[in-house]
Amino acid sequence: MRVLLDENLPEGLVEPLRFLGHTVDSVASLRLKGLDNGRLYREVASAYDLFFTKDREFANRVSTLAEPAPVGVILTLIRQQPEAQFVAAFMASFVSTDWS
């Protein structure tokens, strides 16, 4: 899958997801940090299968679009914690989910 990580998620997620065989980018690595939500969505929506974010407003806004989103926007609800623990919790959830 083609995965994009929002700027509010740790960069430490990139390598573990790539290790699983996914193509992974982050908003930071694409130098799109700070872009308003609407523009960010238009820039990346068609290039990715999944977009992970902790931004509730962004996820809610996409869910109200009249047209179906070409990218699955996944609101990440893992509580804030040190990066290593966050990455471990995220990856445990990711590998136990059927993304088909």
Predicted regions and their residues:
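Polar low-complexity intrinsically disordered regions
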Residues: 18, 46, 92-100
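Short, basic, glycine/proline-bearing loop/turn elements
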Residues: 20-30
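Residues at secondary-structure transition points
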Residues: 31-39, 56, 81, 85
